[in-house]
């Protein structure tokens, strides 16, 4: 086998390895994107619940809370 053929085989092997690595990384990115979307939705739901909780608690009593007993 001459040098050019050997170098060509090495390059083909490297390209094949890089293609496999790219496929693995793409799969990992998909998983992370799905997880990020899920976390974003959970954050939005929690923000909505906090707003609802704050608005319902402010509606329940318009008077300021009395100071704690130790004052």
Curated annotation (Swiss-Prot):
Highest taxon above the source species: Bacteria
Pfam families: SlyX
Region Disordered: start-end pairs: 49-71
Family label: Belongs to the SlyX family.
Protein name per Swiss-Prot or TrEMBL: Protein SlyX homolog
